[in-house]
């Protein structure tokens, strides 16, 4: 339920800068600046044309399996996670799904010795307005979830701090 856009366009970067306070340094210094988009509510409903396309054309499921999966997904969306209780709930869930590849991208970058940072520090409404007006994506099918910057930072910056393992980890036997 995601799409990734490598944003190289300097004009667009300058337009979003005033509204992307968490990306100020990254917009200048990062060698790669990626927008992570989440699929829209209309595409992520259990009965959407998009999910039908994924199951039929991409996953090549037979029709009877598609119907079974659609019903399981309906139950998940309606009952398990109650994603239809508000307009925002389904989009929030879809945006959470984008954090799975985001985490993998951050980890892969670290393994390769590339610095990276995830970015949520931006005015979503204003940044989306700019990206949509510039034709970066179609708001009928996508919404901006977060951003990520890749590159090499100045090594003289303050080191990261972390809480003790015992404060964040619990074992239940």
PLM-predicted stretches and their roles:
Residues 1-173:
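Acidic, surface-exposed loops and disordered segments
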């Amino acid at each position: 339920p995601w799409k990734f856009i490598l944003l190289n366009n300097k004009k667009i970067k300058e337009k979003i800068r005033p509204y992307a306070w968490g990306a100020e340094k990254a917009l200048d210094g990062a060698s790669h600046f990626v927008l992570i988009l989440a699929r829209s509510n209309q595409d992520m409903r259990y009965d959407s044309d998009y999910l039908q396309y994924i199951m039929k054309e991409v996953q090549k499921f037979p029709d009877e399996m598609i119907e079974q999966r659609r019903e399981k997904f309906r139950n998940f969306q309606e009952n398990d996670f109650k994603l239809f209780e508000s307009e925002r709930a389904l989009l929030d869930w879809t945006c959470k799904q984008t954090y799975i590849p985001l985490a993998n991208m951050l980890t892969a970058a670290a393994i390769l010795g590339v610095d990276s940072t995830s970015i949520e520090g931006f005015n979503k409404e204003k940044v989306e307005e700019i990206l949509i007006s510039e034709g970066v994506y179609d708001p009928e099918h996508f919404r901006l979830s977060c951003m990520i910057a890749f590159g090499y930072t100045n090594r003289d910056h303050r080191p990261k701090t972390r809480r003790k393992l015992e404060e964040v980890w619990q074992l239940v036997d």
